[in-house]
């Protein structure tokens, strides 16, 4: 098996943009420690250097194969190792997926993300999802897939099928990775990210906060993302959704200001990435989401489901966007 570890920036290596430097963990911690209002202001300034602050990229996420995953990730209700009441479902039919994609596009989504609960796909699975990707791409939607660990050649096959993005999150601080995930390691994730980059796919890579981590550990997650070379085009920041039956069902609540800080620090350290306000929005008041947008979040998952958990209804999202004079970003082939 060929190993394609995604290269990290060397400590002495600086890119032409001053904010694309190597980020030491202590530097990221210093950002977290800034006075709240100063941090939000700094993040907003960085955001405006690279994006229209009123434009929001809308993605819809669909679970095309649900439950029964052999992995043991303490946050995930789809693991076969936990009794969460989730019923295992086989792969959806192509026609049903395409119909869901048509609905998503009609409602304003520009990107359609598809997830399958596998440790990694088999060659026969790649053939099936390649057909699905081609059908969704033909609708004029940007495509994203999250299918787990990839073997050699699979990323190239997905690229050939028309996939734009591959989602593969780093989940948490590398130093605590195996406290949360017990059936793979951080290097496994980096290997697949390397395969994805080698194939010419764009990268969607983020993590989850609210899993009883400390602030320095949140800084470690952001540093590990910011030091990917090149940086991810999309960075989803998820707030843990506590699901009964998972080991993290009783995790301590993360203070809302700490989540907003995480969004702001992600924006400052990854100035050209789309920072996605992802899972956990059903528990976020409008004012909190507004602060996240001010701090540089410029993408959301749009639709009533995020794989197996609830998401705000489309109508409530559009109402909030109208209140804030935000508008959905249209998909163009050259967009990140």
From Swiss-Prot:
This protein's pathway reads: Cofactor biosynthesis; biotin biosynthesis; biotin from 7,8-diaminononanoate: step 2/2
PROSITE patterns recorded for this chain? RADICAL_SAM
Q: How does it assemble?
A: Homodimer.
Q: Which domain of life is it from?
A: Bacteria
Cofactors, names only: [4Fe-4S] cluster; [2Fe-2S] cluster
List the protein's name. Answer: Biotin synthase
Task: Give the Gene Ontology MF terms in alphabetical order.
Answer: 2 iron, 2 sulfur cluster binding; 4 iron, 4 sulfur cluster binding; biotin synthase activity; iron ion binding
Q: Which UniProt keywords apply?
A: 2Fe-2S, 4Fe-4S, Biotin biosynthesis, Iron, Iron-sulfur, Metal-binding, S-adenosyl-L-methionine, Transferase
Which EC class is the enzyme in? transferase
């Amino acid at each position: 098996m060929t190993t394609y570890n995604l290269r990290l920036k060397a400590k002495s290596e600086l890119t032409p943009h001053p904010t694309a430097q190597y980020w030491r963990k202590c530097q990221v911690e210093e950002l977290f420690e800034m006075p709240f209002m100063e941090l939000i202001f700094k993040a907003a300034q960085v955001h405006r250097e690279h994006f229209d602050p009123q434009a929001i990229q809308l993605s819809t996420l669909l679970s095309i194969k649900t439950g029964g995953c052999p992995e043991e990730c303490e946050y995930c209700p789809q693991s076969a190792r936990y009794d969460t009441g989730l019923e295992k479902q086989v792969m959806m039919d192509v026609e049903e997926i395409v119909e869901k994609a048509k609905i998503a596009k009609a409602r304003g989504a520009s990107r359609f993300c598809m997830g399958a609960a596998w440790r990694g796909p088999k060659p026969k699975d790649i053939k099936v999802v390649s057909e699905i990707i081609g059908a969704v791409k033909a609708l004029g939607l940007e495509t994203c897939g999250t299918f787990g660990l990839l073997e050699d050649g699979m990323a190239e096959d997905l690229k050939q099928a028309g996939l734009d993005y591959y989602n593969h999150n780093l989940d948490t601080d590398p130093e605590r990775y195996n406290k949360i995930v017990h059936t793979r390691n951080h290097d496994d994730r980096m290997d697949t990210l390397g395969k994805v980059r080698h194939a010419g796919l764009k990268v969607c890579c983020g993590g989850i906060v609210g899993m009883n981590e400390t602030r320095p550990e949140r800084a470690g997650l952001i540093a590990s993302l910011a030091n990917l070379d090149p940086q991810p085009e999309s960075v989803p920041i998820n707030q843990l959704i506590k699901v009964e039956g998972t080991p993290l069902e009783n995790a301590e609540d993360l203070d809302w200001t700490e989540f907003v800080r995480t969004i702001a620090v992600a924006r400052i350290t990854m100035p050209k990435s789309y920072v996605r306000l992802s899972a956990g929005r059903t528990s976020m008041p409008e004012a909190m989401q507004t602060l996240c947008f001010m701090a540089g979040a410029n993408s959301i998952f749009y639709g009533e489901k995020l794989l197996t958990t609830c998401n705000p209804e489309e109508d409530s999202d559009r109402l909030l966007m109208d209140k804030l004079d935000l508008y959905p970003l249209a998909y163009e082939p050259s967009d990140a």
